[in-house]
Amino acid sequence: MQDNALLKQALKHPLYEKIQKLNLKVQNSNYTIDDSFNIFCDEKLDEEIKNIALELKPWRKGPFKINKLFIDTEWQSFIKFNILKPYMQEIKGKVVADIGCNNGYYMFKMLEFNPSKLIGFDPSIKYFLQFFLLNSLAKTPIQYELLGVADVPNYGIKFDVIFCLGVIYHRSDPIAMLKQLKQSLNKDGVVFLDTMYIEDEREIALIPQKTYSKIPNIFFIPSILGLRNWCYRAGFSEFEVITTRQTDFEEQRKTQWIDSYSLDQFLDKNDSNLTCEGYEAPKRVYVKLKV
């Protein structure tokens, strides 16, 4: 891990010490991968693991199983992963980054496709600690850096494949972010990206006045042609639309593993095709980019 201020904060977090102590007690562990990432370890640790996991709420991406404990996360993230699964053969033997990796769910899922290196980037201490708990039990070779997308071009490693899922609409300068992704690629590298989008044939973007689906840090939601033009402006020459999907209550919903609201509270009570602010309800487009 790189030395940075967030990492220093994380290492001083009380839960980091708890997880370190737990890690020393793990004698046998293995994992399997299906829609959830399933960890099997010493059952005598079950109560300790559950207590730490509860302290780490909210759990957004997943799900996970640790022995008999099922962490039923807000997002059924395997739905998004399965959209990209036909492309996962491209990561075999490759150096792969997951930018905005949350707790590492997608990277854990990628292990079965045998990349040579997996590095996640996310500047969230909470998500890092969730990953640290999971990986202390599963003991995979995945690396996690408490860094954001702007840090990746200067990280010191270039990537063959970059996943950047659900990040770009949080950036106030999306073209600059796309340029940072491009700068982080090896020659012939590819980017898989998803974003919320609006249905419009024009080359435009929605700029929410204050919030979108009650989320304050959403800056731009482009049309698909608007997204394409951002990518071209950033220096990408190939723009392939993989698919689109409207976010529904199967994919995102409130569970006991989050304490806040979820999708049902973000939409218009009388029309689920609109957000509570009156904008189009969330839909996502998945794209593959090449330089």
UniProtKB/Swiss-Prot annotation:
Alphabetical list of SUPFAM superfamilies matching this protein:
S-adenosyl-L-methionine-dependent methyltransferases
**What function does this protein fulfil?**
Catalyzes carboxymethyl transfer from carboxy-S-adenosyl-L-methionine (Cx-SAM) to 5-hydroxyuridine (ho5U) to form 5-carboxymethoxyuridine (cmo5U) at position 34 in tRNAs.
Q: Which domain of life is it from?
A: Bacteria
Q: Which reaction does it catalyse?
A: carboxy-S-adenosyl-L-methionine + 5-hydroxyuridine(34) in tRNA = 5-carboxymethoxyuridine(34) in tRNA + S-adenosyl-L-homocysteine + H(+)
Q: Which HAMAP family match?
A: tRNA_carboxymethyltr_CmoB (MF_01590)
Q: How does it assemble?
A: Homotetramer.
Q: Name one Pfam family in it.
A: Methyltransf_9
User: Does NAD appear among the keywords?
Assistant: no
Q: Tell me a GO biological process for this protein.
A: tRNA wobble uridine modification
Which Gene3D superfamilies does the entry link to?
Answer: Vaccinia Virus protein VP39
Q: Does the keyword Transferase apply?
A: yes
Which UniProt keywords are listed?
Transferase, tRNA processing
Protein known as: tRNA U34 carboxymethyltransferase
The family assignment reads: Belongs to the class I-like SAM-binding methyltransferase superfamily. CmoB family.
Q: Which NCBIfam families match?
A: PRK15068.1, tRNA 5-methoxyuridine(34)/uridine 5-oxyacetic acid(34) synthase CmoB
Q: What is its EC number?
A: 2.5.1.-
